[in-house]
């Protein structure tokens, strides 16, 4: 009997006790992503036996990220030293139209590798076993197969599996589960130009290049990253180089990769051949498709599955599903926008709507969109124009 669910199951896997006794109780997490390590930490801290398999001992390379302070709601003790820089507002540009968006609470600029390293320490300290250098290569009956670079293989049996191995998840492929759609992401480290405010990020809407946007995120008073996200098949390096040249900026280094996107029919829980698989983070498409941000929502997804496995219900997962669904609907509208649509939108934003946008964290859009429409009901016409096009 196969089961795969996009909607949340009302019958999560019940915990079989909170002690570490019994091999049948252990939880296998495949992938040392931020979402995977966060889930490992929370589950191990609650007394569950957790083993994390990660093929890359270095836990992947650096990437500068921007997150909202909503992260503190999920991780109250997030270390202050992990915040490299604070962003107090955004400059939004479309053509020649500019809108300054002050934030009530500053966003944080963080470094992915540093956050992973810290979570690795927390997970190990809580009792999770971290096995690096092992790649998941498939399954044989009820056994999971892992291989080292030297060709050594081991086979493990685990009833509960958290797939935390990214947008191109091998786990989901091995179990015949759908993987999320992906976007390309590329950004260049640059010296901040004289016209840039170190306290404000800049967003340019250029739909003829990408249905998403370009960004400049300062990570210090002197430097930042300029990048874009776009769909596979578009010449992302050419687009970035051209935009850098247009702004008169020289790339110092590049950071790139793929990022998952959310789709409502992606499974949150699936049963296959005696296993129960929970995709989290990018593997689960737990990414805000409006902004292509997945750090906070990935952590949210890891915590939601931990709550379910510990018998605390699916409430947190349902809230995340509603949040990602709201971003999905807004993205469907924005992907139809032309440059003229963005110009009209920025030009037409009133003071109340601008203030509301700055007060609502991007990780609370599901509730905030109603506040925004209440502040400026006329925005509905922009949404309808995008939907009907």
PLM features: what roles do these ranges have?
Residues 307-389:
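C-terminal helical "tail/cap" subdomain of flavin- and related membrane-associated enzymes
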Residues 19-35:
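Beta1/beta-strand and adjacent pyrophosphate-binding region of the FAD-binding site
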Residues 35, 58, 168:
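Conserved Rossmann-like nucleotide-cofactor binding loop
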Residues 232-309, 314-316:
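FAD/FMN-dependent oxidoreductases across multiple families
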Residues 168-241:
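Conserved FAD-binding catalytic core of PHBH/FMO-like flavoproteins
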Residues 22, 74-77, 81, 85-174, ...:
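Conserved N-terminal helical subregion
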Residues 56-78:
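Conserved N-terminal glycine-rich FAD pyrophosphate-binding loop of Rossmann-like flavoproteins
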Residues 28, 32, 41-63:
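Glycine-rich FAD pyrophosphate-binding loop
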